[in-house]
Amino acid sequence: MSACGRKALTLLSSVFAVCGLGLLGIAVSTDYWLYLEEGIILPQNQSTEVKMSLHSGLWRVCFLAGEERGRCFTIEYVMPMNSQMTSESTVNVLKMIRSATPFPLVSLFFMFIGFILSNIGHIRPHRTILAFVSGIFFILSGLSLVVGLVLYISSINDEMLNRTKDAETYFNYKYGWSFAFAAISFLLTESAGVMSVYLFMKRYTAEDMYRPHPGFYRPRLSNCSDYSGQFLHPDAWIRGRSPSDISSDASLQMNSNYPALLKCPDYDQMSSSPC
């Protein structure tokens, strides 16, 4: 993988992480996950009359039509005690939504940690482990978010299946843009996590490629040994003796066993033969 491609992938993973974190933060803090509308069907001309309409988030519900129009309440306290809801289905849906609320929060926390570690890893490229850890946090964030989305959808579908059908009333719902932001954030977060892990694998492989093998050099005998330098060079390692070396050693041994030099009394020169 070229350096240019690695930089482009690093930049792309950072952009995906920023976008995913921003979209999830907006989705968690806004109240447009779900739109609910409840009314009656007029028998004269089969037209509909809206009795109650609202939009809901993870924390609040705001009424768009009905007696409480323009007012917002928390999910725990859907409306004042002296008010009446048109149907119990709306109350049950809003209560079941609370079971999915912790998962987007955990996802947001994991995504923030992964974003911080990813930026530190980009600032210090030699710390390749940070890219791997940030990728794991991004993947965990995406998994937590998708679990929350599945629970959110299943809670609404279960209530719709258990709802008593009535020919004179209708109950409609649709998902809002906050829910869409959370779904897009899941895709971006998982993509950022996969790219971060891929970058870690490439950097780790490149480090191993240029790292010398530990068995290439032999250890030195000592700092003061005359033979310690030869262990730094593979060419100077001990090899088998050649036949020429063996013959040279044999000739030296024969010369050493020759009779000692004798001195003749009549001459000043040295001779090897007896006088």
From Swiss-Prot:
GO terms for biological process: calcium ion transport; regulation of AMPA receptor activity. It is found in: Membrane; Postsynaptic density membrane. The keyword Membrane applies. Pfam families: Claudin_2 (PF13903). It comes from the Eukaryota. Brain. Enriched in Bergman glia, as well as a variety of neuronal populations including locus coeruleus, olfactory bulb, lateral septal nucleus, interpeduncular nucleus, and the CA2 and rostral/medial CA1 regions of hippocampus. Keywords: Cell membrane, Membrane, Postsynaptic cell membrane, Synapse, Transmembrane, Transmembrane helix. GO terms for cellular component: AMPA glutamate receptor complex; glutamatergic synapse; postsynaptic density; postsynaptic density membrane. It is a multi-pass membrane protein. InterPro entries: CACNG_subunit, PMP22/EMP/MP20/Claudin, VDCC_g5su, VDCC_gsu. The chain crosses the membrane at residues 8-28, 103-123, 129-149, 181-201. Regulates the gating properties of AMPA-selective glutamate receptors (AMPARs). Modulates their gating properties by accelerating their rates of activation, deactivation and desensitization. Displays subunit-specific AMPA receptor regulation. Shows specificity for GRIA1, GRIA4 and the long isoform of GRIA2. Thought to stabilize the calcium channel in an inactivated (closed) state. Belongs to the PMP-22/EMP/MP20 family. CACNG subfamily. The L-type calcium channel is composed of five subunits: alpha-1, alpha-2/delta, beta and gamma. Acts as an auxiliary subunit for AMPA-selective glutamate receptors (AMPARs). Found in a complex with GRIA1, GRIA2, GRIA3, GRIA4, CNIH2, CNIH3, CACNG2, CACNG3, CACNG4, CACNG7 and CACNG8. Interacts with GRIA1, GRIA2, GRIA3 and GRIA4. This is Voltage-dependent calcium channel gamma-5 subunit.
